[in-house]
Amino acid sequence: MADLIMGIDPGTLVCGYALIKVENRYHIHPHSFGKVKLSQKLALAHRYKQLFTEISTILQQESPKAVVLETQYVHKNPQSTIKLGMARGVLLLAASLQDVPVFEYAPNTAKKAAVGKGNASKKQVQLMVSKLLRVPDLLAEDNEDIADAFALAMCHAHLAPYQDLKKTLV
């Protein structure tokens, strides 16, 4: 039986998500993917509410075995770091309310899993994930967030057997 893993690239305006089907750890197939687009015109609280609602709906419909996020990193702008942290909190809550464990990986770990090098550019990640999963739609310029989400899910598929389950965030 195949497991579904959901990678999420959080954002305050665009949140990319991708679900992969994993069989025997090495057979990885794209299942579904998309973006939650949040209007800049909405107050921040309403954007987080929309993010929570849409991701919760996807979690409910798909029932993934795990959710995977990037570890928090510090932007040059402290406000951006705080806002992104709040978006991550919304995603953690959505997953925890549905009892889906959440794992996190550093961006360079996910890039290394997808491309082979931890300092790969977003374009390199996009190209490699598109080729590995045979999803040409990922090459569109505005699909970088989805490619990052796929990279996170793929990273977990490869590293999950070595994860200490006590390290889950939820």
Curated annotation (Swiss-Prot):
Q: Name one GO cellular component term.
A: Holliday junction resolvase complex
- Residue positions annotated to bind Mg(2+) 2 are 70
An annotated Gene Ontology molecular function: DNA binding
Query: Does the keyword Magnesium belong to this entry?
Result: yes
Catalytic residues? 9, 70, 145
Q: What does this protein do?
A: The RuvA-RuvB-RuvC complex processes Holliday junction (HJ) DNA during genetic recombination and DNA repair. Endonuclease that resolves HJ intermediates. Cleaves cruciform DNA by making single-stranded nicks across the HJ at symmetrical positions within the homologous arms, yielding a 5'-phosphate and a 3'-hydroxyl group; requires a central core of homology in the junction. The consensus cleavage sequence is 5'-(A/T)TT(C/G)-3'. Cleavage occurs on the 3'-side of the TT dinucleotide at the point of strand exchange.
Say which family it is in.
Answer: Belongs to the RuvC family.
Name recorded for this polypeptide: Crossover junction endodeoxyribonuclease RuvC
What is the species listed in this Swiss-Prot or TrEMBL entry?
A: Chlamydia trachomatis serovar D (strain ATCC VR-885 / DSM 19411 / UW-3/Cx)
Identify the coding gene: ruvC
